[in-house]
């Protein structure tokens, strides 16, 4: 039904491919939280609403962030043509995080035998349970060093278990050169891993950026102490900054970027950096405007593959 692979462009930078063609993958960080049920959507229709609005906003991918959804969620992504990056929910603590590519300082977690066994059991079960959903194109075993351990071994095991999908070994670090993808987190403005250093062997992606905040009175979890990586008072101000980021992303695509993830789909409790409010009653910028500034990402003329 689909092939997820990599191949070089004419500059020798590895690109993420879909059915042997380069398709820039752009999606929101989606934590799947709800103000009443937390990890449980109030209705099936509410769950599907998020997917529909995501596509209407111009995204073609969702990074399902440190959560596993019901099988029906993945079915709806299959049906609606939305790609999925699936995170392993983070567990355990105690690592030192080094988010900067090429710098030392990050540490691998020395997990207890019980913790390591539980991780392997749960990650194995997640991959087994979700294997038959073609929308999933990327597995992400670790995020921002949280509980990260034996990175090379885990990435290689993940790839051996499921060679049909790409492996993003550590989204945002700690960075170990393994798997298929090198993933940088950078807030608020978009940056990318250096394609001259990492591109010959790995796809380079921006695993998180943005986080532009706009509290909407009457729809906040907390009326005070809300935050975004950069906050605004009006929707027009937010959109102007978002639009400028989209122009930057287009330039990065030409230089070697294969994918980007914007933080985030909805507000989550005191995080008011969603494109929708936590209760989903307010879409902060009209979906038509958001789509208009992302359509440019999908032009085939941006990238030429080596044939």
Pin down the residues of each PLM region.
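N-terminal carbohydrate-binding accessory modules
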Residues: 1-54, 288, 295-304
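Substrate-binding/catalytic cleft of secreted carbohydrate-active enzymes
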Residues: 49-53, 61-293, 302-306
């Amino acid at each position: 039904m689909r092939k997820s692979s990599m191949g070089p462009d004419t500059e020798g930078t590895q690109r993420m491919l879909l059915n042997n063609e380069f398709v820039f993958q752009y999606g929101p960080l989606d934590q799947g939280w709800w103000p009443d049920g937390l990890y449980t959507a109030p209705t099936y229709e509410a769950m599907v609403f998020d997917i529909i609005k995501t596509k209407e906003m111009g995204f073609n991918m969702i990074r399902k962030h440190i959560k596993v959804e019901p099988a029906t969620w993945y079915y709806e992504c299959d049906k609606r043509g939305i790609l999925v990056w699936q995170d392993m929910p983070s567990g355990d603590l105690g690592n030192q995080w080094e988010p900067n590519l090429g710098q030392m300082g990050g540490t691998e977690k020395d997990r207890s035998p019980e913790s390591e066994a539980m991780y392997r059991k749960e990650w194995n079960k997640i991959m087994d349970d979700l294997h038959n959903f073609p929308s999933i194109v990327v597995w992400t075993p670790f995020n921002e060093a949280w509980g990260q351990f034996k990175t090379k071994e885990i990435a290689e095991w993940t790839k051996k278990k499921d060679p049909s999908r790409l492996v993003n070994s550590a989204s945002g670090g700690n960075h170990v050169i393994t798997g298929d993808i090198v993933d940088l987190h950078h807030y608020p403005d978009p940056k990318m891993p250096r394609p001259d250093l990492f591109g010959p062997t790995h796809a380079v992606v921006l695993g998180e950026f943005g986080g532009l905040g706009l509290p909407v009175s009457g729809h906040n979890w907390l009326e005070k102490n809300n935050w975004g990586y950069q906050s605004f008072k009006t929707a027009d101000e937010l959109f102007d900054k978002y639009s400028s980021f989209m122009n930057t992303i287009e330039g990065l695509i030409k230089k070697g970027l294969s994918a980007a993830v914007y933080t985030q789909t909805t507000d989550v409790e005191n995080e008011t950096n969603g494109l929708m409010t936590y209760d989903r009653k307010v879409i902060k910028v009209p979906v038509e405007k958001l789509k208009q500034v992302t359509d440019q990402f999908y032009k085939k003329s941006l990238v030429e593959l080596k044939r």
